[in-house]
């Protein structure tokens, strides 16, 4: 996990720990059910970011935003597919389905506000979210390996999506999903780092400008 270097990073990490605590409280070691709810929420940030970056491109009438828009929308679609896999495995009950609706609505509102005003912090937070997801799937995989969770057949939809062998198991699916989350972590931390560098360059240019103005005065 990336070490926080400023207040923005600390806030992002604190929010991640807060949401992790809620997930641990509700689901404990029921990782299949945890995945259903969390993957519903995980599909939100990419869609929000992709939409807002798309709108920024339209407003500015400039190119260059395409790769990030596509990356964010691909992330959202990938997380949606994760949800489809674990619905087949966990068979969520009516309470969990209602929880999904409520959690998605709250998080959609929260993250949209965050991304409009604090895009760097938003990407950092999702990077930390994905780091926690990697931990959760690693713990899930360990339970499967030690026999605490039955290593059932992977759902057909997951086998087709990842191109797994026809006899693929839950452990194979978890490894594939975990690899996706690692990629999302790298992408979001990278975007946050780039925005951080851009902010620093702006501050440096402002400082130089102030020095030059003082010399003129």
How should each PLM-predicted stretch be described?
Residues 1-217:
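Non-heme di-metal
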